Regions:
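Extracytoplasmic/periplasmic sensory segments of membrane signal-transduction proteins
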Residues: 46-53, 62-150
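Solvent-exposed, extracytoplasmic
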Residues: 97-110, 177-180, 184-226
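Extracytoplasmic/periplasmic ligand-binding sensor regions of membrane-associated signaling proteins
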Residues: 109-112, 118-191, 196
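Juxtamembrane/transmembrane-helix boundary motifs in multi-pass membrane proteins
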Residues: 4-12, 37, 41, 97-98, ...
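Extracytoplasmic/periplasmic sensor domains and loops in membrane signaling proteins
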Residues: 93-98, 102, 127-159, 222-256
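Juxtamembrane extracytoplasmic/periplasmic/luminal helical "stalk" adjacent to the first N-terminal
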Residues: 7-86
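Short, hydrophobic beta-strand elements of compact beta-sandwich sensory domains
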Residues: 168, 172, 180-191, 258-287
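N-terminal sensory and localization modules of signal-transduction and trafficking proteins
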Residues: 1-10, 39, 46-47, 119, ...
Length: 287
């Protein structure tokens, strides 16, 4: 005789099917939840990358205009004649001054130029910008602008203590055949060329936007740049999109990092041809 405490076979089958259905539903729900989180995370990181590209493109446009201005100053025959010839008369001096003046005022960067000069690094200088009324340029003061060589750097004006930070670009002026060093051309731009394009940038709670240049890092916040310890220097990034030759497309990177016990996703977009990048941190717990 069968035990009265044992479920009939049919009841066992029903309960088994119910239990299986519950387990299946839980598994499907968990899988959908994971897939949903992955989808949201992927979309959020892609959106951050897209937004960084927009800001980076605007900054690149300004820096390309700066390069164009410096290139013009270094090869313009009227300016180079004034810089390089031993004997220059008044007419040549005025012609060089007016040529640079016209280029300065017509530049798309005009409102951002703090200091712009071309010099033979001795006794001839053509200078424009809002800081040109500071200490005079001469053989000694010129050297203070070029202590780190040519290129792009984040600095302050050496002749005006307490002046705001600026992005400085410089390059040499050479002879017509490009062999002899004739002088230097220097351009200092206010940091609004970075902060203006980033104005209104959408950040979620806990996110942060940064400007990285060389090994240094600045947070972009409330229209200003604040230097901070670069704890992202050793981040192991994964390449997302590589810059294409001849096409304005910045190289994009992604990674994950732990800072102060909290996990973050990192999206980085490097500017074409420059040791600079825009970086966004996104808290991992928001996905």
């Amino acid at each position: 005789m069968k035990s009265s405490h044992r479920f009939p076979l049919r009841r066992q089958i029903v309960w088994g099917m119910r239990f299986f259905t519950i387990l299946t539903s839980l598994a499907v729900g968990a899988a959908l939840f994971i897939l949903s989180n992955q989808y949201v995370r992927a979309n959020s990181l892609q959106a951050a990358e897209f937004n960084l590209r927009l800001v980076a493109t605007s900054i690149e446009t300004s820096l390309d205009s700066a390069d164009a201005l410096l290139n013009w100053a270094s090869i313009n025959s009227t300016v180079r004649r004034y810089i390089s010839q031993e004997d220059v008369n008044g007419t040549q001096t005025i012609a060089a001054y007016e040529a640079v003046q016209e280029k300065y005022y017509s530049s798309t960067l005009y409102s951002h130029i703090l200091r712009f000069f071309i010099t033979n690094e001795n006794d001839r200088h053509l200078q424009f910008g809002t800081l040109n009324s500071s200490a005079a340029l001469n053989r000694t003061t010129i050297k203070q602008f070029l202590t780190k060589g040519y290129g792009m750097q984040f600095t302050t004006d050496p002749l005006l203590p307490g002046s705001p930070d600026c992005i400085a670009l410089s390059q040499p002026v050479r002879s017509g055949k490009g062999t002899l060093h004739r002088g230097s051309t220097y351009l200092a731009l206010d940091t609004a060329i970075i902060t203006d394009p980033a104005a209104g940038y959408s950040l979620t709670d806990g996110s942060a936007l940064y400007w990285e240049m060389g090994s240094r890092l600045w947070q972009i916040q409330n229209g200003s740049l604040t230097e901070t310890e670069n704890r992202l220097r050793e981040v192991d990034y994964t390449l997302r999109t590589e810059s294409k030759s001849g096409v304005t497309e910045q190289t994009a990177w992604q990674s994950k990092v732990q800072l102060d016990g909290q996990n973050y996703y990192v999206v980085k977009v490097t500017l074409n041809g420059r040791s600079a990048a825009l970086v966004q941190l996104l808290p991992a717990n928001t996905f």
